């Protein structure tokens, strides 16, 4: 769930798979960007096909900001030894829209509860470290149309308001169509400015 007071969020820079071995057990941490629980479920279902001989595919995801949607699974490992440690890594790095699946090939030596927690956490940490993180910004899409005689004035005004070339896409047809990406941070700053202006006006007394 999105919180309109939050204008940015952290997400994985790229999908990534990272592997390490602990007491002959092979752990593969996989980071994926997801936008919904359904998308996460579809990706999770593919891992037994990708690694058909693996013993476990444990996972956790966190989606949205504010009251984020969080779920995790131990996938057959002892309760609390896999899913929660993986989710803890996602939260510790302040990531969202993030799914991590840790695949395990059992190597014949039991790791114990503490060993499993440490191994699944380490696999998730390694994958996140290699994937990297990027700061993303929420924005709204806006479509403007005007005549050709007004297009230059509109372009000048938009740039004066802080819209860069990357956020402006102009199409020319019977009229001029301008598609904008409006960052929520820009909307909030303008709302705050209007609120301050309104308070100043209301607080002015004639003498």
Residue ranges and their predicted role:
Residues 79-91, 106, 116-120:
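Conserved mixed alpha/beta catalytic, RNA-binding, or beta-rich assembly cores of soluble enzyme
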Residues 180, 185-189:
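Terminal, non-globular segments
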Residues 134-150, 178-180:
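Short glycine-/aliphatic-rich beta-strand segments at the starts of folded cytosolic domains
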Residues 11-16, 125-130, 154-167:
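Short amphipathic beta-strand starts and helix->beta connectors
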Residues 96-106:
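Glycine- and acidic-rich phosphate- and metal-coordinating loops
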Residues 117-139:
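Long, charge-dense
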Residues 1-80, 196-207:
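C-terminal regulatory domains involved in ligand/effector binding and gene-expression control
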């Amino acid at each position: 769930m999105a919180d309109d007071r939050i204008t940015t969020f952290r997400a994985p820079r790229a999908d990534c798979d990272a592997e390490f071995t602990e007491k002959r057990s092979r752990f593969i941490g996989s980071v994926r960007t997801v936008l919904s629980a359904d998308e996460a479920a579809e990706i999770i279902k593919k891992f037994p096909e990708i690694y058909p001989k693996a013993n476990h595919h444990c996972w956790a995801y966190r989606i949205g900001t504010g009251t984020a949607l969080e779920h995790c699974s131990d996938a057959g490992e002892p309760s609390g030894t896999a899913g929660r440690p993986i989710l803890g890594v996602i939260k510790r790095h302040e990531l969202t829209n993030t799914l991590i699946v840790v695949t395990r090939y059992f190597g014949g030596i039991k790791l114990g509860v503490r060993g499993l927690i440490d191994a699944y956490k380490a696999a998730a940490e390694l994958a996140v470290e290699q994937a990297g993180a990027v700061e993303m910004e929420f924005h709204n899409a806006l479509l403007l149309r005007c005549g050709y005689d007004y297009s230059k004035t509109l372009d000048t005004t938009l740039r004066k308001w802080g819209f860069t070339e990357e956020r402006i896409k102009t199409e020319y047809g019977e009229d001029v169509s301008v598609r904008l990406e409006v960052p929520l941070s820009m909307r909030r700053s303008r709302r705050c400015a209007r609120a301050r202006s309104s308070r100043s006006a209301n607080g002015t007394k004639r003498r």
